[in-house]
C-alpha cells in the first residue's frame, strides 16, 4: 500500500501507510498522547480517532483537554440522548443536533405530548446505561433510499437525510441502534464521562418562525466531575443574573404576545432606570461638546437607498410603507443618514469642526423571532448614537476625545471587564473595501497611534473592519457568558462621499469631511439588560428605581411621620415610597431586600419622638439609627458618588 505524507502543526512531514488512523499517528508520537487523544483535525476538519487516512494532508491530534475534545464528547453524548429518546418514546421524531463550547442540544417532536423537564432524569438513566455498557461506536454508510424508507414517519429526519449530498448517508451504529451521524465521535460509549441534561425549551425547525415549533433538550458533558460542577455553578450564577428573570422579579419590563415579540413594555421601575441613564448620557455628551437633536423615525426609502442600507441591510429592515402616491416610507434601521441630513442643512465651515451630533434615536430592526431575547435582542430599540464630522487631520484627536469619554462613562457605571479591539481591512483582499489606500493606511495608523498614546491595551484584527473604514470595538461579556460589543468608534469615508458632504476650508475651497460613528453604551434596551446582569439587580443608589422604602411600625400611629419623611426625601429628588400594606414587619423588611431597594427606613415611637430613622442598607443585617437630616446627607452623598472618579 502506497505511503501518504502527513504534515504536523510544527511543520514536520512524515510518511505513513495509506489507511493509517489518527490513533496510529498519535501512538507514533507518544503513548501518553495516544491516551489523551479522542479525535483529530484533518486539514482543519474534525474527524473520528479511527478514521482511515487515504491521502496526503495536515493533521492535528485532538485531546480531551481541548475545546475540540469537548465537542467530540458532546457529539457522542447527544447521540446517546437521541437513542434514549427513541427507547423511551418510540414514535418521537428527531430534528437537529448540535454541540459547541456551551454544551449540546437535540430537537424533538412528539404528537401526544411534550417531553417534560421531569422526564430528563429518566432519559439520563438510559444514557448512563448505554455508557456503562461500553458499546463500540461504528461509522457505517446506508443508502439514501433505505434511510428514507426507515424514516418515512419522521419528517424532520427525512429532511436531514435529503440534505446529505450523494446516494448514501453516514450513520452511527451503537449497539442495536442506528442513528444519523452528527460530527466527530468517540470510539466507545464508555468514554462518555460526566454529563447533565439541563433543560427543555422551544425552537423552530430550521430556525424559521413559519416552521413547526419543536422541543429542544439542552445538555452538557465533561471528562471530569470537577469541570461539570464548575460549569453547573456558572450556569446557576448566570440564571440568577439573567436580566429576564430579574426584570420580572423587579417589575422592570414585559413583552406582551398580543403586541408582538421583541417589543418590550417598560414598567415604571424599568422606565425610571432608563430615564436616569438617558439623562446621564445627554448631560455627559452635552458637556463634551455634542449637540443633541431629534430626527424622524420614518424616512423616505430613497434616503436608505442613497446611504446603501437598502442594498446591504434590506433583510434586517421592515418592509417599506406604500403611502399610495408613489411615496415609500421606511422605519429607520440606523440613525446615521438622519444625522447626515442635519449636517447638510447648512453650509459648514472648518471652524465648526469637529461637529458633534448626538441623539437617543429610536430604530427598528427586522429580527427573527428565534433571535429575540428579553431586552438584549429586540425589534424596536433606542440607540445612544453620535456622529462627529471632522477634517482628516482631526481624526486622531477626536478619536482620543471619544475614547476618553467612553472610559469615563464606564467608570461611572463601574464597568471594568472590557477589552479593546482595533479592526483593520484585510491587506491581502483590499478590493472589498472602500478604494483609497492612502486613506486606509493613514486612518489605521492614527487609530493605532491614539491607542498607544493613551497607553490602552488592545488586540488587532485584520479583516474585521467595515467596508467604509477601520474601527475600534469595546468588547465585554454578559453574565450569561456571551461576548457583546459595548461600544464602537467607526471611521466612515464612504457616506460623506455618497451624500457629497463638504465643508469650506481655510483656503476658501470645499473639502470632504470624515464621519465618525460612535455609540457610548449601545441601545438603552441592551445596556439596561447588561447593567441588570452585572449588578444582579442591585443597582447602585443613583440608578435604583426605588432608592428608599419607609416602613412605619404602625400605620395608625407612625404613618403621618413616615409621610412627612417621604415628603422631605422627595423634595431632595430622592425616589421613595411608604409601605403601608400592614403586613408583619419582618415580611416587609424581607420584601424590601428581595426587591433590592438600597435603603429601608423603619420608623416607630422612638424615631418619631426624636426625629430620627432606623436605617438598614441592602445586603446588610444591622440597622443604624440617625437623624433624618443626617440620613438625607448620607444618601445624597451616595447618589453623587458615581461621578467622583471623573471630577
UniProtKB/Swiss-Prot annotation:
InterPro entries: aa-tRNA-synt_IIb, aa-tRNA-synth_II, aa-tRNA-synth_II/BPL/LPL, Anticodon-bd, Anticodon-bd_dom_sf, Beta-grasp_dom_sf, TGS, TGS-like. GO terms for biological process: threonyl-tRNA aminoacylation. GO terms for cellular component: cytoplasm. SMART domains: tRNA_SAD. The keyword Hydrolase does not apply. Pfam families: HGTP_anticodon, TGS, tRNA-synt_2b, tRNA_SAD. Binds 1 zinc ion per subunit. Zn(2+) binds at residues 336, 387, 517. Residues 1-63 form the TGS domain. Keywords: Aminoacyl-tRNA synthetase, ATP-binding, Cytoplasm, Ligase, Metal-binding, Nucleotide-binding, Protein biosynthesis, RNA-binding, tRNA-binding, Zinc. It is found in: Cytoplasm. The keyword Cytoplasm applies. Its cofactor is Zn(2+). Belongs to the class-II aminoacyl-tRNA synthetase family. NCBIfam families: thrS. HAMAP family: Thr_tRNA_synth. Catalyzes the attachment of threonine to tRNA(Thr) in a two-step reaction: L-threonine is first activated by ATP to form Thr-AMP and then transferred to the acceptor end of tRNA(Thr). Also edits incorrectly charged L-seryl-tRNA(Thr). This is Threonine--tRNA ligase. The gene is thrS.
Amino acid at each position: 500500500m502506497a505511503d501518504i505524507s502527513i504534515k504536523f502543526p510544527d511543520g514536520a512531514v512524515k510518511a505513513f501507510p495509506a489507511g493509517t488512523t489518527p490513533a496510529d499517528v498519535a501512538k507514533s508520537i507518544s503513548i501518553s498522547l495516544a491516551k489523551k487523544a479522542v479525535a483529530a483535525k484533518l486539514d482543519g476538519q474534525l474527524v473520528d480517532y479511527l478514521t482511515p487516512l487515504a491521502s496526503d494532508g495536515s493533521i492535528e491530534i485532538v485531546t480531551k483537554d481541548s475545546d475540540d475534545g469537548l465537542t467530540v464528547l458532546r457529539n457522542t453524548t447527544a447521540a446517546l440522548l437521541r437513542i434514549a429518546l427513541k427507547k423511551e418514546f418510540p414514535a418521537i421524531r428527531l430534528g437537529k443536533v448540535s454541540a459547541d463550547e456551551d454544551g449540546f442540544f437535540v430537537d424533538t417532536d412528539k404528537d401526544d405530548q411534550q417531553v417534560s423537564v421531569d422526564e430528563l432524569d429518566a432519559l439520563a438513566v438510559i444514557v448512563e446505561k448505554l455508557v456503562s455498557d461500553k458499546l463500540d461506536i461504528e461509522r457505517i454508510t446506508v443508502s439514501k433510499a433505505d434511510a428514507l424508507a426507515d424514516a418515512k414517519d419522521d419528517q424532520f429526519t427525512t429532511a436531514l437525510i435529503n440534505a446529505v449530498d450523494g446516494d448514501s448517508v453516514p450513520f452511527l451504529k451503537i449497539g442495536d441502534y442506528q442513528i444519523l451521524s452528527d460530527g466527530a465521535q468517540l470510539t466507545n460509549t464508555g468514554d462518555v464521562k460526566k454529563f447533565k441534561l439541563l433543560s427543555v425549551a422551544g425552537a423552530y425547525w430550521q430556525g424559521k418562525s413559519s416552521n413547526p415549533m419543536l422541543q429542544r433538550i439542552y445538555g452538557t458533558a465533561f471528562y471530569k466531575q470537577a469541570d461539570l460542577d464548575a460549569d453547573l455553578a456558572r450556569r446557576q450564577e448566570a440564571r440568577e443574573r439573567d436580566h429576564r428573570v430579574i426584570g420580572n422579579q423587579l417589575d422592570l419590563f414585559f413583552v406582551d404576545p398580543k403586541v408582538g415579540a421583541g417589543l418590550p413594555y417598560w414598567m415604571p421601575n424599568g422606565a425610571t432606570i432608563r430615564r436616569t441613564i438617558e439623562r446621564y448620557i445627554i448631560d455627559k455628551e452635552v458637556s463634551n461638546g455634542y449637540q443633541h437633536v431629534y430626527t424622524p423615525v420614518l424616512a423616505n426609502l430613497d434616503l436608505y437607498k442613497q446611504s446603501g442600507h437598502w442594498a446591504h441591510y434590506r433583510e434586517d429592515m421592515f418592509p417599506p410603507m406604500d403611502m399610495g402616491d408613489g411615496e415609500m416610507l421606511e422605519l429607520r434601521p440606523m440613525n446615521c443618514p438622519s444625522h447626515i441630513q442635519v449636517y447638510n442643512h447648512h453650509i459648514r465651515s472648518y471652524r465648526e469642526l469637529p461637529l458633534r451630533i448626538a441623539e437617543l434615536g429610536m430604530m427598528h430592526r427586522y429580527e427573527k423571532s428565534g433571535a429575540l431575547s428579553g431586552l438584549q435582542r429586540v425589534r424596536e430599540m433606542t440607540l445612544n448614537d453620535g456622529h462627529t464630522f471632522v477634517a482628516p487631520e482631526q481624526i486622531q484627536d477626536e478619536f482620543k476625545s471619544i475614547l476618553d469619554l467612553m472610559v469615563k462613562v464606564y467608570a461611572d457605571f463601574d464597568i471594568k471587564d472590557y477589552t479593546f479591539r482595533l479592526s483593520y481591512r484585510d491587506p491581502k483582499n483590499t478590493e472589498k473595501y472602500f478604494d483609497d489606500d492612502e486613506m486606509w493606511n493613514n486612518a489605521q495608523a492614527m487609530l493605532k497611534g491614539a491607542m498607544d498614546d493613551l497607553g490602552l491595551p488592545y488586540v488587532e484584527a485584520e479583516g474585521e473592519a467595515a467596508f467604509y473604514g477601520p474601527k475600534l470595538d469595546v468588547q465585554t461579556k454578559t453574565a450569561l457568558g456571551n461576548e457583546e460589543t459595548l461600544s464602537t468608534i467607526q471611521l466612515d469615508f464612504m457616506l460623506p462621499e455618497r451624500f457629497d458632504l463638504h465643508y469650506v476650508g481655510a483656503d476658501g475651497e470645499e473639502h470632504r469631511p470624515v464621519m465618525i460613528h460612535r455609540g457610548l453604551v449601545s441601545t438603552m434596551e441592551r445596556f439596561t439588560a447588561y447593567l441588570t446582569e452585572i449588578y444582579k439587580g442591585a443597582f447602585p443608589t443613583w440608578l435604583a428605581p426605588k432608592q428608599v422604602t419607609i416602613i412605619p411600625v404602625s400605620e395608625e400611629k407612625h404613618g403621618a411621620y413616615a409621610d412627612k419623611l417621604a415628603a422631605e426625601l422627595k423634595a431632595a429628588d430622592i425616589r421613595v415610597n411608604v409601605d403601608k400594606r400592614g403586613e408583619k414587619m419582618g415580611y416587609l423588611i424581607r420584601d424590601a431586600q428581595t426587591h433590592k431597594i438600597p435603603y429601608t427606613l423603619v420608623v416607630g415611637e422612638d424615631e418619631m419622638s426624636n426625629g430620627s430613622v432606623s436605617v438598614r442598607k441592602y445586603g446588610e443585617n444591622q440597622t443604624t439609627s440617625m437623624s433624618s437630616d443626617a440620613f438625607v446627607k448620607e444618601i445624597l452623598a451616595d447618589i453623587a458618588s458615581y461621578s467622583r472618579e471623573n471630577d
